[in-house]
Amino acid sequence: MKHKMHVQPSTVTLAALLILSCPTCYAADRASWYGENQRGLPMANGQRFNPDKLTAASWFFDFGTMVVVTHANRSVVVEITDRGPTKRLVNEGRKIDLSRAAFAKLADLDFGLIDVTVRKQ
């Protein structure tokens, strides 16, 4: 006798929420970079932005959190120091903006936007 497994929509929703709320889990995202035009400007954490440091802006991690960002078998560890990208871009699938130095460790700056995975270190 074969048994069919019936999954309730609420079960799927709960599973998705658990995965998304897991602070050490990873998520597929899009990333961009910001650089010279923000040099020296205050970030959301109160410090001044330096595009030469390995930092990132995100709404999804606390300030000071170290995250591993991976693209095409290359990874970089960055500290969350700012908030961004803008809410409109977050709604379009962009979850993190990298400093110029961090982005350059993953891809040529000319790409501008890359697919990444992000996980808490």
Report residues per predicted region:
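Secreted/periplasmic proteins
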Residues: K2-L18, P23-Q121
